[in-house]
């Protein structure tokens, strides 16, 4: 399910049953939100390619805030709890600092540290392994590279919340909402697919009603 929620009052403006975040569907949903007359100041999302592409197509001037928890969680997963290399250990420390950035000075210091890390380990990031039998090359430290470049690509949209305190820096609100919904569904595991869908619709209706 894809859900569009007002973070201020936890009101679900629109939802769609889908098995994935799909560009055409999200593009249509965003157009429908605008057609409803909603004034959208910013969007906080997990950074899925289809979602970002749809936002830039339908709302090219909108402020996009990347969910910091999502970035941090994925990078920590790739770097592991005990990285083998110093580059991984140092990058992991920087990743752990992300959620502590509360001022523009914090941001500038952190970015400076990240740039220093890149300059220090740029040759390490380029190291490749080679298989003579196939002539195939691949990056030797792909998970460290993935972590770093995930951050680097997200960087322009990571700290919008520092300029506007009304912008949520995470999607924790909607994640909590989904968690609560899942707990209710778990109590009714015997429901058919159709009845589960109807249950979700009524759940959203009554939750929205309580927010008005």
Each PLM stretch: what is its role?
Residues 21, 85, 188-190:
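A short hydrophobic/aromatic micro-motif that marks alpha-helical segments and, especially, helix-coil
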Residues 33-36, 82, 94, 194:
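Low-complexity, intrinsically disordered/propeptide-like segments
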Residues 42-49, 54-96:
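Conserved beta-strand -> loop -> alpha-helix junction used to position metal-binding or nucleic-acid-contacting
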Residues 1-44, 49, 53-61, 154, ...:
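RNase H-like nuclease fold core
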Residues 10-14, 26-29, 38-42, 66-70, ...:
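Glycine-rich loops and low-complexity Gly/Arg-rich segments
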Residues 23, 68-78, 82, 109, ...:
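Short alpha-helical interface patches
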Residues 42-52, 89-212:
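Acidic/histidine-rich catalytic cores and adjacent linkers
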């Amino acid at each position: 399910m894809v859900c569009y929620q007002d973070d201020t009052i936890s009101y679900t403006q629109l939802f769609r049953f889908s098995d994935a975040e799909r560009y055409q569907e999200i593009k249509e949903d965003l157009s429908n939100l605008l057609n409803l007359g909603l004034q959208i100041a910013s969007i906080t999302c997990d950074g899925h390619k289809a979602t970002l592409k749809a936002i830039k197509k339908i709302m090219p001037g909108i402020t996009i805030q990347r969910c910091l928890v999502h970035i941090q969680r994925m990078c920590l997963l790739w770097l592991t709890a005990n990285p083998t290399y110093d580059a991984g250990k140092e990058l992991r420390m920087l990743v752990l600092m992300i959620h502590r950035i509360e001022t523009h000075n914090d941001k500038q210091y952190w970015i400076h540290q990240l740039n220093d890390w890149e300059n220090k380990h740029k040759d390490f990031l380029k190291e490749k392994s080679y298989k003579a039998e196939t002539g195939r090359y691949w990056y030797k430290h792909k998970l460290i590279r993935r972590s770093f470049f995930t951050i680097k690509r997200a960087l322009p949209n990571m700290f919008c919340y520092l300029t506007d305190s009304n912008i949520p820096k995470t999607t924790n609100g909607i994640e909590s909402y989904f968690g609560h919904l899942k707990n209710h569904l778990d109590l009714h595991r015997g429901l058919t697919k159709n009845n589960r869908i109807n249950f979700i619709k009524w759940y959203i209706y009554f939750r929205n009603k309580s927010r008005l």
